[in-house]
Design a protein with these regions (language model features):
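Structural preference for solvent-exposed beta-strand-turn elements
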Residues: 1-249
Length: 249
């Protein structure tokens, strides 16, 4: 056995809460679709973020990381393979925007590990109705077609990542679209993060009680600059210390 001596200490001071990775992920995507350069501070690298940065490069967006600041320079899609690493969120977030920007040409997504075993059926059932073709080749997913304007019905019990991907993709189109949630939306908070990021980029979505999302066509993403919001779940630990009488803010 090991004896540990714990000496109480008086904690006080100011703590900077790490940036929300979920918010950063969505802001990074909005910045990549903007009509100018964006600079986001408070950026924390992660496997998902690295995968998204790599994927966005194939869609024409260059990202440069310096300290905790990421510079995003949008560009013209190169048509190269979109490598999503092992990130399910990257794959689900990028499929609709890639279809919106592809001009109907074939798009290849690459994955590692068991990524291509992750569920994607909500997209396929929607897109097949719109004439989008897809096939899986081992760790590659090949899709051909265009993201079309119109109405899309999704279950609220599936991952909110599908809703986020559709919101981002449909906002890139010229015509109006609507997403209908067929039952209770389970992950409202994550969808709200997406709507907040889009609003910061100048893109409006009419949220009708999280049951219908109306996306006006012909909008343009504006550059997004500033600090990424803090992660409230990580900040809760320090708030707890403050409630216990410690002078932590």
């Amino acid at each position: 056995f090991m004896n540990l001596l714990i000496t109480p200490a008086k904690l006080q001071g100011t703590v900077k809460v790490p940036a929300s990775k979920s918010a950063a992920h969505r802001l990074l995507l909005c910045a990549a679709f903007a009509n100018g350069e964006s600079r986001l501070s408070g950026f924390s690298p992660s496997a998902d973020m690295t995968a998204t940065r790599n994927g966005l490069k194939a869609l024409g967006a260059e990202t440069e990381l310096s300290g905790d600041t990421v510079l995003v320079r949008p560009g013209v899609p190169t048509g190269g393979e979109i490598d999503c690493g092992e990130s399910g969120s990257t794959l689900r977030f990028l499929i609709p925007p890639a279809l919106a920007l592809s001009g109907g040409r074939e798009i290849a997504f690459a994955g590692h590990g068991r990524l291509m075993e992750r569920p994607l059926s909500p997209y396929f059932s929607l897109f097949e109705e719109k004439g989008v073709r897809w096939r899986q080749e081992g760790n590659r997913l090949v899709i051909q077609g265009k993201l079309l304007t119109g109405k899309y019905a999704l279950s609220g019990k599936i991952s909110s990542q599908f809703v986020t991907g559709l919101l981002l993709g449909l906002a890139l189109l010229e015509g109006d679209s609507e997403i209908l949630i067929t039952d209770r939306l389970e992950s409202k908070g994550y969808v709200d993060l997406t709507l907040c990021a889009m609003e910061r980029a100048g893109v409006s979505v009419e949220n009708r009680d999280h049951r219908r999302f109306f996306i006006p066509g012909g909008q343009k993403f504006r550059p997004v600059s500033g600090e990424i919001e803090g992660d409230r779940s990580e900040g809760a630990f320090f708030l707890g210390m403050d409630f216990l009488g410690r002078q932590v803010s």
